[in-house]
Every structure is written in C-alpha cells, then in structure tokens.
From Swiss-Prot:
Catalytic residues, chain numbering: 490
Family recorded in the similarity comment: Belongs to the glycosyl hydrolase 65 family.
pH dependence of function: Optimum pH is 7.0.
UniProt keyword annotation of Cytoplasm present: yes
SUPFAM superfamilies: Galactose mutarotase-like, Six-hairpin glycosidases
Annotated organism of origin: Lachnoclostridium phytofermentans (strain ATCC 700394 / DSM 18823 / ISDg) (Clostridium phytofermentans)
The protein's name in its UniProt record: Nigerose phosphorylase
Activity regulation, per record: Does not require divalent metal ions.
Positions that bind substrate: 348-349, 604-605
GO biological process, one term: carbohydrate metabolic process
Protein keywords: Cytoplasm, Glycosyltransferase, Transferase
Temperature section of the record: Optimum temperature is 40 degrees Celsius.
Keyword Cell inner membrane: no
Length: 753
C-alpha cells in the first residue's frame, strides 16, 4: 500500500472535487486541496471548526479564514497560473498516511521549462500551525517574481462574513521590529530578515476575530515590495534566477480566533517564531509522528483487495483530519471541515455513523463528541419548548449552543427559483434518539459511567421526556403512537408511526430506565441529586408504560415485511428508473409535497433497514432478508449515509457478496469524488465523513463481525470471497487488541503499548 492519491485534472468540476479529495486538516481547521494561486472562484478554504457567522438573512455558516497560502508567480513578465496557462505536466499528490499535500507543475515557455513544487501540511502537533514549502526552478536565466501573502477575499456560500479587515505588517531587521503603516520598498542590500504579515478579520454577528499570521524564510535574497489593498496584503519578491537554480521559501502560518484565548495575537506570533526556529523538516517530522501514533491503532489491513484497502484507510484519513482532539466539547459537521455546505452544522451523522470509529480507536474523542451534545442540552430544551413539547428536542442542524440552523426552506424549486417549505427542522424528531444511542454505545463500550454525572444522565432523561410528550393514544386503543414525523428516508414528510422513529423512541425510554437503575445501585449520591431534579417515580412509571405500549410496526400478516410508516404500502409501487424518468430537471428535488418520489414507495435512503441493523436481535433472519429484498430496489441512495446500512444488513444475513458493492460505495465516496453535489439548486458538495464512518462500521462490524459480548471481544468474520485477510486493532477499556481474521481462523491478541 503506497498511501498516495494523485490527480492531474484541471477542468472546473475536477478543481472543485479535488478541493474535497485532497483536503488536509488537524481537527481545528481543514484546508481544501486547491492550488496556491487560486482565488475564491475556485473554492479555496481554510475552514474553521465550531465558529459561525450570519450575514443578514443568509444562512448562518462556519468561517473560512483569510488565505495565507496564497502564492502566484511571474517569469519574465508572464504570469504562470493554473488553469489559465496549460502546463506540460501537472500532478497533485496526497500522502494520506501523513496528511501532506504535494503539487508539481511544469510549464513550457519560449525559452525553456519552469517547474513549481509545493508541499503543505496542517500540523497535528500544533493545531494553529500550517506550513507551506514552495519552490520555483527554471532551466534558463530569468526574472522571477513571487507574490505571496494573505488573501482576505474569502470564498463564502452565504457571506462575506468579515465586515472589517485590518492588515498588520512588521519589518524584521537584526532582531528589530518596526510596524509598517504604508507600502514599503526594500532592496536586498538592506539586510532584510523578512516581513511578518497578519490580518485581523472581524465577523458581522458576534464581532469574533479571526487572526492569521504568516512569515517566510527564503533561500535567496530578493527585492521586496509590500502590496496592500482592502482585501489582500502581499509581498512582491523579485529574484534574478539562474538556470536550474531552485528558489525556495517556507511559509509558517498560524490561525487563531478570539474564542481561543484573550492573547491570540501574541500567541499567533509566538508560534510562528517558534516554527521558524524549529524549521520545516523538524516540524514535518513531528507532524508525521502524530499521524503514525494514530495509525498504530486505527489502520485496517485488507489482504486480497488493494482497492478496498486503499479506499477504507483513505476514508479513515478524512475522519482523523476532522476529529476535534483539541477540544473537550466539540462535534463534527456533516461535511467535516471541507467547507460551508450544510452550514457546517452537526447532524445525526456523528452519533449514528462516525461514533463507532472514534469509540473503537480514540474513545476520548468519542467522549468529546458526546460532551458537545450534553453542553447543548439547553438549546435542545429551548427548541422543545418552542414547539410545545417537554424535554429536549435536539437541533436537526446544530451549531453553537445547540442553535438549530435548519431553515424552513431548505430546497429551491428549480422551475420557479422560489424556496420550498421543508420540514426537516420540525419533524425529524428521531434526532434526539441518536444522541441517546451515542451515549448508550459509549457506556456499553467503555464502561465509563462518569459521563452520566457530567450531564449525560440529564440528557437522556430530557430526551425521554421529549418522546413521552410526543405520544398519542387513539380513542379505544391501548397503545401509543407517534404522528406527523419524518424518518431517515426524508422524501416522505409528515407521516405517522415511522418504524425507525418509534423504535428509537422506545430505546430512549429503555435507556432512561436503565441509567436510573444503574445510578440508584452504583452512585447513590448522584441518584439523590437526580431525585431532587426529577419526579423520578412518576417519570419511571410513565417510561415503563410507554415502553410496554408504544406501537412498533411489526411484519404484516402473511408477510415478513415491516411497513416504513402507516400507509406506505398503499403508495404507488413503481421502479426507481420510472421515478427518475419523471424528472423534468436534473437538479429537481425528489421529495417534499410535490416531488417525484413523494407519492411512491421510492425512498431516499435506508429507513426500515437502519432499524433492523440496530435491533437485529429482535427479528428472525427471514424478516431481515425479506425487508432487504423489498426495500433495496426501492432506495435511491440519494444520501451517502444509505449504502453502509444495506451493507451491514447483508453481512448480518451472511451475504458478504451483496454487502461488498455497498461497502465500496461508502469507502469510495470521497476517493473518486463522485458524491452528490446538488439538492435542487443548493450546493451540498464536500467530503462525506458519515460515509467514511459507515465504511469502517461495515468493515469491522459487518465483514469482521466485531462485537463485545459480556465484556469480551468476539469476532465472527464474514469476509468477501476475494478477501484473504482482515486485520485491525481496537482500543478497549485501556488496552489495545489486534483482531486478525481469515476464512480459516480468527485470532484476538492483546498488544503491549
């Protein structure tokens, strides 16, 4: 395995796609894999985790920092930029074992050849640090001009987000620092040590500051001029290049926000200076060492299938890039740190699709993700109250403080160009159960019950109260129902008794009962605290009653099929191809009140199948199989979340040959850059961390058959026919275990740390 992804395409679509595919990041920030000379029309972005802004009536979205990677060149008064001037050769190369992006471009001029090389990484050791090494070589004598500095004209979807931009320049000479207040021209004879550039960009909404500092070290003296406008501050470096002489410089960049610390300016400069003293090679070595530590536990080896092996580990690379290791309470957005799609909001994706990877390899990160939900409980309670419910109704698109960024109008009609009313925010009530499922999974795997006293217990109980307040009972009926919801499918809105939603509500009731019982027996002091906060006896009686009487759709008479929601089987039963043929526009939204799928049995993504994966022990094998056979041909898989659930259920039915294509669809979601990029006229492109997490779940839990049974690791592999071996490690309750599975045998061994 060479751990390298390469690409040479330069068409507009490839440039956008490569921004996602060649992303580097360290959890604090993500840097799209665009070239140094690209301006905002090519979607460059240094996307920041957990900080947002709203401009006017536009959608609230995460911030992209001013671009301090910006660099362009002129050779003998000719600008050499991609894609403006076609190169003789060009390649992007991502070392996804170590998060290093390399670029090589070769141009032919009328005098000879010009070669540009660059290498960048977002330091995994120092979260605020980004390093770029850049070189230019011509095979003839020429004048080379490099423009490099900070581009403050940032790509935004609903921006611009900075209402005030202030540049600061410092001239460094013989350990002296002089603040420059105007454009400055220096000759190389002035014994120049460099200019350090900074930008302070202030947001509209909260007046937060994003502070970016950069400095360079160059291997050759130059004539230097500072060029400043409202949106950029650049050095103009003029070199007298000799034939085959490499001009090389390293940029040391720091990114801070005013949310990080009070003295962000001082810290920014301090880290840049330390980085310069440390040097490029040493910084890269330290960065690579952190990556090696991560891969020591998380690498998965698939023998007999190089494509699957590469794609899966590349998927895990993307999860590592966006893991908030720097925080005690932060989650992961649906598109990671690849941009502002979906408003940089946190969805159910994190708990249901990504959590297992972190739980099995970095439990402390899993706890960080869950703490985010605990810390946004008040926002969930406010939302529930707003809609007239009790307890905690979590945000469908969660931002700071649990604020729900989801709009009432998420889709634009392609024909009228008018916004369409959608009900994701109002009716996808299954979101709260995802948080409970995540906490329950964490408790079961880690046996770390401290999270309950840190707010986890209250979170579970408030979610249980929320679902109890949703229950309805028809006159003359003994069971409860849940009406007017949207299940995972999403194309069918405002339905009654969605099977997944109802079963997850029951899981929430069960979990609340379980944790109250646990705390009563294990932590009397904390239980007494809960007694003071809640009417525990009354609450327990209600939850037990709800558990016993909540209607969960069961297989129909004379059939093993479970109806997705009331009346689903009465909808038009038509093929996926027929529904697709009814589209009048390629970007037309399939769901909602008038979508082509809305009145048919065609669904967007796994719904009943997701329920069966989570609660497989409650159903006979034939029920699992028949529902797979029925729902899969009717599923569009319009979401990257869908394929892994079908893959998992096929594995549970001992059909790895059918699971494999769905596994590969998840694993290749970002590798090949062919993910869905539009919902109506709304751009939804970016990386797909839920698909990455889904690929991991399928490999480990599906093909690998990994599970914890009574505190003991078990593995019952169901490998695809062409797989020779599946090997992986997990961190379980403080110890590393290696599971090595072939078709003949399985070994589980404890690894000394």
């Amino acid at each position: 395995m060479n751990w390298t992804l390469t690409n040479s395409s330069l068409d507009k679509d490839s440039i956008t796609s490569n921004g996602n595919r060649f992303l580097i990041g360290n959890g604090y920030l993500g840097i799209r894999g665009t070239l140094e000379e690209y301006r905002k029309e090519y979607f460059p972005a240094i996307n920041l985790a957990g900080i947002y802004d709203q401009v006017g009536e536009g959608w609230r979205e995460p911030l992209n920092a001013p671009n301090a990677l910006y660099t362009r060149i002129e050779v003998d008064e000719v600008e050499y930029q991609l894609p403006k001037i076609e190169p003789r050769y060009h390649e992007l190369s991502l070392d996804y074992r170590h998060g290093i992006l390399d670029r090589q471009t070769v141009w032919a001029s009328n005098k000879g050849t010009i070669i540009v090389k660059s290498s960048r990484f977002a330091s995994m050791k120092e979260k605020h640090l980004v390093v770029l090494n850049y070189s230019i070589t011509a095979d003839y004598d020429c004048e080379i001009i490099v423009y490099t500095g900070i581009d403050g004209s940032v790509w935004d979807i609903h921006g611009p987000h900075y209402d005030k931009v202030e540049f600061q320049k410092q001239l460094l000479r013989h350990n002296e620092t002089e603040i420059l207040n105007e454009k400055y021209l220096l000759e190389s004879e002035s014994k120049w040590n460099g200019h350090r550039l900074s930008i302070a960009a202030q947001t509209h909404e909260n007046k937060d500051i994003v502070y970016v500092t950069e400095d360079i070290i160059c291997n050759k003296e130059a004539k230097i001029e500072l060029i400043e406008s409202d949106k950029e501050c650049l050095r103009k470096l003029t070199f007298h290049g000799k034939a085959k002489e490499e001009i090389n410089f390293t940029k040391y960049i720091t990114v801070f926000t005013s949310k990080d610390c009070v003295d962000y300016k001082e810290q920014s400069i301090k880290i840049v200076n330390h980085a310069k003293d440390t040097g490029y090679e040493r910084l890269q070595e330290e960065h690579k060492n952190v990556w090696e530590q991560l891969w020591n536990i998380s690498e998965v080896t698939i023998e007999g299938d190089d494509e699957a092996n590469d794609a899966l580990n590349y998927s895990l690379y993307h999860l590592h890039c966006i893991a908030p290791r720097h925080s005690k309470s932060l989650s992961i957005a649906a598109r990671g740190l690849s941009g502002q799609t979906y408003k940089g909001a946190v969805f159910w994706d994190t708990e249901m699709f990504m959590l297992d990877f972190f739980l099995y390899t970095q439990p402390e990160v899993a706890k960080t993700l869950l703490r985010y939900r605990i810390d946004t409980l008040e926002g969930a309670k406010k939302k529930a109250k707003l809609y007239g419910y009790e307890g905690a109704f979590y945000a469908w698109e969660s931002q700071e403080g649990g604020y729900d960024a989801c709009s009432d109008y998420n889709v634009t009609d392609v024909f009228t160009k008018r916004p369409m009313r959608t009900y994701f925010k109002d009716k996808q009530v299954h979101i709260s159960s995802a948080i409970v499922y995540g906490i329950r999974s964490y408790l079961n795997y880690t046996n770390d019950f401290s999270i309950l006293a840190e707010g986890g217990a209250e979170t579970i109980l408030e979610c249980a109260k929320f679902y109890y307040s949703l229950l309805e009972k028809k006159i003359g009926k003994e069971y409860y129902e849940i009406h007017d919801v949207i299940g995972p499918d999403e194309y069918h809105e405002r339905v009654n008794n969605n099977a997944y939603t109802n079963r997850m509500a029951k899981l929430t009731f069960e979990t609340a009962i379980d944790i109250l019982d646990h705390e009563k027996n294990k932590d009397e002091e904390f239980y007494i605290k809960l007694l003071k906060q809640y009417e525990i006896k009354d609450l327990l009686d209600k939850l037990k009653d709800a558990c016993n009487k909540l209607y969960i759709p069961k297989p129909k008479d004379n059939s093993d099929l479970i109806e997705q929601f009331d009346g689903f089987f009465e909808l038009e039963d038509v093929s996926l191809e027929e529904v697709r043929s009814r589209l009048l526009h390629e970007k037309e939204y399939w769901g909602g009140a008038y979508g082509v799928a809305s009145h048919t049995q065609v669904i967007k993504q796994a719904d009943v199948v997701t329920m069966l994966v989570l609660f497989k022990e409650e159903y006979q094998r034939e029920v699992l199989q028949q529902n797979l056979n029925y729902y899969e041909p009717r599923t569009e898989h319009g979401s990257s979340l869908s394929a892994c659930m079908y893959s998992l259920l096929y594995c549970m039915c001992d059909q790895p040959q059918y699971a494999y294509p769905f596994f590969m669809k998840s694993a290749l979601a970002d590798w090949n850059g062919k993910g869905k990029e539009w919902a109506g006229l709304v751009y939804i492109g970016g990386t797909h961390p839920a698909a990455a997490g889904g690929a991991y779940m399928t490999a480990i839990k599906g093909f690998g058959g990994f599970q914890i049974e009574n505190g003991v690791i078990k593995a019952t592999p169901r490998l695809p026919k062409h797989w020779v071996r599946l090997k992986y490690r997990v961190l379980y309750q403080g110890a590393i275990y290696e599971i090595d599975a072939s078709k003949e045998q399985v070994s589980i061994s404890k690894i000394e740390m």
